[in-house]
Amino acid sequence: QSNNLKNSLSLFFTYFKNKYNLQTSTYSIFGFSAGSQFAHRYLLFSDDIQVDRVVLGSAGWYTFLNNEPYPYGMRNMPIERERYEWYLSREVLFILGAKDNDPNHESLNNSKGAKQQGSNRFERGQNYFKNLVIFSEENEIAFRWRYKVIDDLDHSTSAISENAFPFLLEGLDY
């Protein structure tokens, strides 16, 4: 991984912060579907510590904290305990749609590694969150993520967004 890709969001944040003289030292991320796939891996593998809050919604597949080969797991990945601690201690809202359960959705990764995570986005998300809970307990790492399932939701950016904004804006004076 090049440092530019590895810390790409941090570079954009710093550029805009300087260009517009912004007075904040942190930023938030909203990732849905493929954006969620990128965002959770960015948090896990970058050196960026400026990320404050993150919403992860309905990724098609994940990098589990287990011994499966990368990109489905962490086998042979150069990551230190401190990064796991940082990753699991972020303020993350993990949102799934209970009806995002189409195993044949046109944009769903149906590779062998992805199918081992579950047959659809909802199952894969449930399994990923369980993996994080187990990993944090086994390694005695604080886990701050929030988990939300929206009962009548399939694969919809707008519905995820409506649930994400209160979390992203929480505590802001606007």
Predicted stretch roles:
Residues 36-47, 164:
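Short glycine-enriched nucleophile-adjacent loop
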Residues 126-174:
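C-terminal catalytic histidine-bearing segment of alpha/beta-hydrolase fold enzymes
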